[in-house]
C-alpha cells in the first residue's frame, strides 16, 4: 500500500490545508457544524482526490478549502421525507443527520413492481403496492450523513427519491443507501418518477438515484463543482426492461472537482453516465476521482460510460458485470491498480477516449475470468479472451491540478478484499466526524428551512400526504373542525398517550364525525 500525496512546488497539499475542527451538539441548542479527522483500522477515510482541491483561483469553480459541504452550518436531524427535503433545499448551510429509512410513505398501486405502471384504479383492489416517488433539489453547502441502525446494522435507505444537484457547489453525501426499485411511472409517459403533489400524479424527473448536472439555464454557461459522494450504496434490482431505471450516479454538463469513493453499485443495468452525449464536452469539465468503488452484478453497462472529462480511476473492483468502463468521445483518464473479475468487457478506450495506465509492478490491472481485455493483458486464471486496442495518453492528475492528494494507492491484489470490507454504506462509522451526539428534531429550524428555500431553485417542500407545505405548523382542516362540532377531536402524543390539547411538536389528531367516520393524522404545532 502506498500513501501518496502529489505536490507541485510552492503549494501546500490539500490534506495539509484541511481544517481540523471540533464540535459540540446539544439536544435543543445547536452549534455550527465542523468536521473532525477520521480513521478506522488505522485507515484515513477523509476527503481526497479532486473534491479536496480548491480549484483554480479566479474561476467559478474555485472554493477555498475545497469541498466542505455544510460545515459551519447547524447540525440537524431529519426523521421524515419532508424534513429531509426542506433542509437539503434550504438556502442555509446544514449538516443533515439521518438514522432511519425514508420514503414519501404515500401508497400507490402499480401493475407490477418490475414495470411500475400506475393503475387507473388506486383503491388497492388490484395490483402491487409501492410508494410514490419525489425529488430533492439539493442546494449548495450541504452535508448528508447516514447513521447505522444498531439493530439492523444498515445505513438509512432512501427509496424512490432522486437527489438532483443542478448547478450547485459544495455538497457531501456519505453513508447512505439509494434505490429506485419499484418506483411508479405513468403508463402513457416515459419512465419518469411520479410523485403525488397536491393530489395530482406529477412526473418529477428521471429515475436517477443521484443526478449531478449544470443546465438549468444554459449548459454553455451554467456550472457546478465540489461534490463528494462517499461510502454509499446504490441498487435497483430486477427490471421489466433495461430502460426501467436510469443511472445510479449520473454526471453531466460543466461540473468540476468531484470525488466518488468507497461506494457499492450492484444489481442494476445502466450504472453511471458521465456526459449525456458527444456534445456534452467542455474545457476542464468533469474532473473526477473515482476510487475504492465496488461494482457487483451490473448486468448492463456504464461503469461508467465517460464522455469528455478527466478521470482518475484507481483501486476499483468489478465482479460479475457485463460492459464496464467505456471511454468515449474526448475522454481522458489515468488507470491504476484495479481488479476485474468475471466481467465481459471491463475497460476500453478504443471508441474516442484515451487512457494512461500505471504498469508499475504490483499496481497494474489484474484480470480474472474476463473477456475483451486491453491489449497486452491476460487473465490470471488462464481464461481465454479477446483483445481491445488501447488509445494512449500521458495524462496524470497533477497535470490538471496545482495540488492533488491521494491518501492510498493499494496494491491491485488487495483491492477485492478492501472493497468488500470498506465499500458501501454501514462499513465505517462516519457520523461522529460531524457531531458528538445525534441531535433531536427541531421544529423551529424545520419551519425556517421550509420558508427559506435556496433562491436558485425555489424548490417546494411536501408533507406526508403530498401537499405543499408553507411552514412546519399546520392546523386541523376545516372539514375536521366541522366534524368536531357534531362529534369530537382527540389528541395524542406520538407514543399514544392521550392529551387534552395539542402540544408543541408533533401530535396525533383523531377526528370522528357524526357518522362515526374516523380520520387520524400527524399535526405539527408551534
PLM region spans:
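Bacterial N-terminal signal peptides
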Residues: 18-31
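Sec/Tat signal peptide C-region and signal peptidase I cleavage site
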Residues: 31-37
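Acidic Gly/Asp/Thr-rich repetitive segments characteristic of extracellular carbohydrate-active
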Residues: 49-97, 492-499
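Right-handed parallel beta-helix
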Residues: 140-146, 150, 169-182, 197-199, ...
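C-terminal outer-membrane/trafficking sorting elements
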Residues: 473-526
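Glycine-rich beta-solenoid repeat tracts in large extracellular/virion proteins
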Residues: 134-138, 157-167, 185-186, 208-222, ...
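Extracellular beta-strand-rich solenoid/capping regions of secreted or surface-exposed proteins
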Residues: 85-92, 105-143, 154-174, 183-222
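Extracellular beta-rich repeat passengers
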Residues: 305-307, 312-472
Amino acid at each position: 500500500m502506498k500513501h501518496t500525496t502529489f505536490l507541485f512546488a510552492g503549494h501546500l497539499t490539500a490534506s495539509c490545508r484541511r481544517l481540523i475542527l471540533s464540535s459540540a451538539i446539544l439536544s435543543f441548542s445547536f452549534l455550527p457544524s465542523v468536521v473532525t479527522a477520521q480513521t478506522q483500522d488505522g485507515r484515513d477515510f477523509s476527503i481526497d482526490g479532486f473534491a479536496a482541491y480548491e480549484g483554480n483561483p479566479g474561476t467559478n469553480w474555485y472554493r477555498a478549502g475545497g469541498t466542505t459541504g455544510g460545515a459551519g452550518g447547524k447540525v440537524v436531524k431529519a426523521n421524515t421525507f419532508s424534513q429531509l427535503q426542506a433542509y437539503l433545499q434550504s438556502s442555509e448551510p446544514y449538516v443533515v443527520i439521518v438514522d432511519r429509512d425514508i420514503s414519501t410513505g404515500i401508497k400507490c398501486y402499480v401493475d407490477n413492481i418490475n414495470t411500475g405502471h400506475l393503475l387507473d384504479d388506486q383503491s388497492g383492489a388490484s395490483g402491487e403496492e409501492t410508494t410514490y416517488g419525489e425529488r430533492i433539489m439539493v442546494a449548495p453547502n450541504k452535508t448528508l450523513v447516514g447513521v447505522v441502525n444498531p439493530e439492523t446494522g444498515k445505513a438509512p435507505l432512501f427509496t424512490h427519491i432522486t437527489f438532483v444537484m443542478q448547478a450547485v457547489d459544495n455538497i457531501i453525501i456519505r453513508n447512505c443507501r439509494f434505490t429506485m426499485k419499484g418506483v411508479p411511472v405513468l403508463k402513457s409517459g416515459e419512465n419518469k418518477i411520479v410523485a403525488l403533489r397536491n393530489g395530482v400524479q406529477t412526473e418529477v424527473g428521471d429515475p436517477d438515484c443521484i443526478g449531478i448536472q449544470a443546465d438549468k439555464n444554459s449548459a454553455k454557461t451554467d456550472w457546478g463543482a465540489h461534490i463528494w459522494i462517499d461510502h454509499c450504496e446504490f441498487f435497483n434490482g430486477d427490471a421489466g426492461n433495461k430502460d426501467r431505471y436510469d443511472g445510479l450516479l449520473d454526471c453531466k454538463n460543466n461540473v468540476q472537482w468531484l470525488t466518488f469513493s468507497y461506494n457499492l453499485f450492484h444489481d442494476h443495468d445502466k450504472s453511471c453516465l458521465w456526459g449525456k452525449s458527444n456534445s456534452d464536452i467542455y474545457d476542464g469539465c468533469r474532473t473526477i476521482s473515482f476510487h475504492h468503488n465496488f461494482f457487483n452484478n451490473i448486468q448492463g453497462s456504464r461503469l461508467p460510460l465517460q464522455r469528455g472529462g478527466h478521470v482518475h480511476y484507481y483501486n476499483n473492483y468489478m465482479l460479475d458485470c457485463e460492459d464496464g468502463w467505456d471511454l468515449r468521445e474526448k475522454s481522458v483518464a489515468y488507470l491504476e491498480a484495479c481488479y476485474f473479475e468475471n466481467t465481459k468487457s471491463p475497460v476500453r478506450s478504443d471508441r474516442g477516449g484515451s487512457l494512461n495506465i500505471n504498469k508499475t509492478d504490483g499496481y497494474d490491472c489484474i484480470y480474472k475470468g474476463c473477456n475483451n481485455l486491453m491489449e497486452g493483458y491476460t487473465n490470471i486464471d488462464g481464461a481465454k479472451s479477446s483483445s481491445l486496442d488501447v488509445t494512449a495518453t500521458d495524462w496524470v492528475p497533477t497535470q490538471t491540478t496545482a495540488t492533488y492528494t491521494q491518501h492510498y494507492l493499494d496494491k491491485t491484489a488487495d483491492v477485492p478484499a478492501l472493497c468488500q470490507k470498506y465499500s458501501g454504506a454501514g462499513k465505517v462509522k462516519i457520523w461522529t466526524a460531524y457531531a458528538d451526539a445525534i441531535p433531536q428534531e427541531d421544529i423551529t429550524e424545520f419551519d425556517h428551512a421550509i420558508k427559506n428555500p435556496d433562491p436558485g431553485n425555489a424548490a417546494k417542500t411536501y408533507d406526508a400526504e403530498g401537499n405543499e407545505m408553507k411552514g412546519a405548523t399546520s392546523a386541523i382542516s376545516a372539514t375536521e373542525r366541522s366534524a368536531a362540532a357534531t362529534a369530537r377531536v382527540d389528541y395524542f402524543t406520538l407514543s399514544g398517550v392521550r392529551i387534552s390539547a395539542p402540544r408543541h411538536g408533533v401530535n396525533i389528531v383523531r377526528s370522528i364525525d357524526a357518522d362515526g367516520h374516523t380520520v387520524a393524522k400527524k399535526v405539527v404545532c408551534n
